[in-house]
Amino acid sequence: MRVVLDTNCLIMAISARNEYYQVWQDFLDGKYVLCITNEIIEEYSEVIARNISPLLSEFVISTIINRKNVVMKSPSYAFHLIKADEDDNKFVDCAIVANAKYIVSNDRHFDVLREIPFPKVDVIKINQFLLDLQNAAETM
């Protein structure tokens, strides 16, 4: 399953003390494919370095870009589907070009995507994504 993780969800997932740490562990175990772009990686790096630590940022980014279950895309078209926070469109564009199942985000700016019929981009909250991963593990 291909997904795009928004930055806040990645930050929640990388903390071993967070209830969503299993999302990061499942990524490391190859249970889903993370779809990224250079822009997304840059944001991950900047936000983790600023809010947590530069060393952790370097480790997380290195881990992501060296995994086999990562799809790196370079969108050639910007869809501009999110007007409230244009910066979030990098996640939308990545999801579209990577044919991701959904974007994992708790950000309300993504809610507008539920009303846009084309191109269809599904968005789920991180708690639902964790349940999806747990359900997938149970059916294996």
Predicted regions and their residues:
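Acidic, PIN/NYN-like endoribonuclease modules and their adjacent C-terminal/linker elements
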Residues: R108-M140
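Active-site neighborhoods of divalent-metal-dependent phosphate/nucleic-acid chemistry enzymes
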Residues: N69-I103, R108, V112
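Hydrophobic/aromatic ligand-binding patch that stacks against planar heteroaromatic rings
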Residues: D26, I64, C94, E115
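A secondary-structure boundary/capping signal
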Residues: D6-T7, I36-T37, N106, K125-I126
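Alpha-helix capping/helix-boundary segments
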Residues: C9-L10, I40, H109-F110
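Extreme N-terminal starter segment of soluble prokaryotic enzymes
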Residues: M1-R2
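PIN/NYN-family metal-dependent endoribonuclease catalytic core
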Residues: L5, S15-R17, Y21-A49
